[in-house]
Regions:
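Phosphate-backbone binding interfaces of nucleic-acid-interacting proteins
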Residues: 512-636
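Beta-strand segments within the central parallel beta-sheet cores of soluble alpha/beta enzyme folds
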Residues: 288-291, 475-477, 557
Length: 636
């Protein structure tokens, strides 16, 4: 038997600053679905995840908790692993950056890069964001705050080591241009090229002296290694890389990675810093980096500081593991952010899982028992209506494969559930309960039930990658024509009011302080005060990507670069501009509008337009060329 082709997939390692919410957990579930699917195709999959455990933020968190940093990360890492296991993820290795072998390799890598002249000693002076563990110049800040998370930054001035990023920039640009699959989706590639690589890279600070919780630079121990140089190398240290030339057989088998699956907020680190580090180490680059969108909790990106957090274990208590897996995989678009709420979860639970799937299996098992004592065979009494069901059944595996090759996991799940919907329609078309009344049609009835069992079973086999427990339960009940005596209820319908009542008991509402950035009415009032007007914040943005919103005749979804941030904005402008025409335009953006979902797609602001008497729209753009997106708009 020929050796299986290896497939190495990784997630970003989870930062151990606290318990992961469902937005964090989405990534491990997504990676697990891909890993399981690749295994089903015959690949020898190695799936690595883990925890990122160093940095100033953790040092401060541990101090607040009254424990050592190691005690703090031991506890949080254990909690993260517990949740990953709860979600039935099939990872092969859980790496921790406090693992002794990882720390030793990071020190050796740092020394190698220093010895060959890629790292040099200097002094850093600028701004530092502790939550993001990132350095910024004054010009990179947005309103004086971190361009990535919007939090306050602190001035930093200290002796530091720097990596010569510009030395490898042209080589990285060439690689990206000649390997279009390297950064996905394409909008993420455009953002990295236009906003970081093409304007020119600054040398990167790769050590700190202002805190101690990190991997010491062994030849200068007052310095600790920059957390991103430490964390990113887990992808190679976890599979046995040794920069002295003693890498393991596993490393040579698995590297380069087939897929780094990460959140869109850390794509800069994985598509600029990490490839350049690898080039300096003379290692091949990963084949693909996919920056997935965020899973939002109705009113924006989940953040414990905002109090809008949903946790996976709480959702599992209400819905079960596979229902949560189904929701986060099915509801996440390929590129745009998805939304999760208790209401949407209950809706999907009842319509898709309890009705479309659960009721289908229940009816099929019950009818097979009722009419044939639990066992059917193919009597071959075919009718025209059978052909379409068989065609859908035969075509679904290829449709799923095509979607999974593009990492369109939500679309792959839709294909499977379309098969289940077709099975339900087949029951309505053939009406087994009517056939059962005519003894002469008994063989036809048995054929119908046989067809149903075969089609549902094929769908269940495909479902294993996404909902493994449910897949197993369905196949056990159907038994290739020998069904169980009593159908097992796969998913029970839920009452929304009861669920919301329990949620309120679990999380009593807390009176929130009124924020400055309230939702702004889109209908003008007769008069407003200057203070009212001052609540609205307009900035210049540049549209770096745009696409049509599915199932909408007038909406476009734009990725708008504002300073160092990218906002997703859905606008009703499709009849006035094409998606292609939007890209590259400088626009005026209302940036502090509360996020809302339009046609199922999250929008984080609004574009300012002029409208004539006929309703034609024209984007408002700066008259003069502005040096960079992010400039404020003001009235004088």
């Amino acid at each position: 038997m020929a050796d299986k082709k290896p497939y190495y997939i990784t997630t970003a390692i989870a930062y151990t600053s606290g318990k992961p919410h469902i937005g964090n957990t989405y990534e491990i579930i997504l990676a697990d679905a891909i890993a399981r699917y690749k295994r089903s195709q015959g690949y020898d999959v190695f799936f690595q995840t883990g925890t990122d455990e160093h940095g100033q933020k953790i040092e401060l968190k541990a101090e607040e908790a009254g424990v050592t940093p190691k005690e703090f990360v031991d506890n949080v890492s254990g909690e993260i692993k517990k949740i990953w296991d709860l979600m039935d993820t099939s990872y092969d290795k859980f790496i921790r950056t406090t693992d002794e072998d990882h720390e030793k390799q990071v020190q050796k890598i740092f020394k190698k890069l220093y010895d060959q002249g890629d790292i040099y000693k200097g002094h850093y002076e600028g701004m530092y964001c502790t939550p993001c563990e990132s350095f910024f110049t004054e010009s990179q800040l947005v309103d004086g705050k971190c361009p990535d998370c919007g939090r306050e930054v602190q001035p930093a001035k200290e002796e530091a080591y720097f990596f010569k990023m510009s030395k490898y920039a042209d080589r990285l640009i060439e690689h990206i241009n000649t390997h279009p699959e390297f950064i996905q989706p394409v909008s993420r590639k455009n953002e990295m090229m236009n906003n970081f690589l093409l304007p020119g890279l600054q040398d990167l600070c790769v050590s700190r002296t202002s805190f101690k919780w990190g991997i010491p630079v062994d030849f200068d121990p007052k310095h600790v290694t920059y957390v991103w140089l430490d964390a990113l190398t887990n992808y190679i240290t976890g599979i046995g890389y040794d920069c002295d030339g003693n890498s393991t057989e596993q490393f040579h088998k698995l590297w380069p990675a087939d897929l780094h699956l990460i959140g869109k907020d850390i794509i800069r680190f994985h598509t600029i810093y990490w490839p350049i580090f690898l080039m300096a180490l003379d290692l091949p680059l990963p084949k693909q980096v996919f920056g997935h969108p965020w899973l939002l909790q109705g009113d924006g990106k989940m953040s414990k500081s905002k109090g809008n957090v949903l946790y996976a274990d709480e959702l599992v208590d209400f819905f079960g593991v596979d229902a949560v897996r189904y929701f986060v995989l099915h509801e996440m678009p390929f590129e745009n952010d998805g939304v999760i709420t208790w209401e949407l979860m209950v809706e999907r639970m009842n319509s898709d899982l309890a009705n479309t799937l659960g009721n289908l299996v229940n009816r099929t098992v019950s009818m097979t028992n009722k009419y044939f004592g639990g066992t059917v065979t193919d009597k071959g009494v075919a009718e025209e209506v059978d052909a379409d069901l068989k065609a859908v059944t035969e075509n679904t595996p290829k449709a799923v494969e095509d979607k999974m090759e593009e990492l369109r996991v939500a679309d792959a799940m839709t294909e499977i559930f379309n098969l289940f919907k077709r099975c339900n329609k087949y029951i309505d078309e053939t009406m087994p309960w009517v056939l059962a009344k005519d003894e002469a049609k008994k063989d036809r009835l048995e054929t119908v039930l046989w067809n149903l069992i075969q089609s549902i079973s094929r769908g269940a086999e495909l479902l294993e990658s996404f909902m493994p427990s449910t897949s197993k339960k369905i196949l056990e009940q159907l038994g290739n024509g020998h069904v169980t005596e009593k159908p097992e209820i796969l998913f029970a319908r839920l009452d929304l009011e009861e669920v919301l009542k329990k949620v309120e008991e679990l999380h009593p509402p807390v009176e929130e302080e009124k924020e400055e950035e309230d939702v702004i009415d889109i209908e003008a009032k007769p008069e407003i005060t200057f203070d009212d007007f001052g609540k609205m914040q307009f900035q210049v943005g540049e549209i770096i990507a745009c696409e049509e919103v599915k199932k909408s005749r007038k909406l476009l979804c734009s990725q708008v670069k504002i300073g160092s941030q990218v906002k997703q904005i859905v606008s009703g402008i499709k009849g006035h501009y094409t998606a292609e025409e939007m890209v590259g335009k400088k626009v005026m953006v209302l940036v502090n509008l509360k996020p809302a979902k339009l046609a199922g797609v999250l929008s984080e602001g609004m574009l300012l337009c002029a409208e004539d008497a006929e309703g034609n729209l024209a984007l408002m753009t700066p008259e003069k060329s502005m040096p960079a997106p992010g400039n404020k708009a003001r009235c004088t």
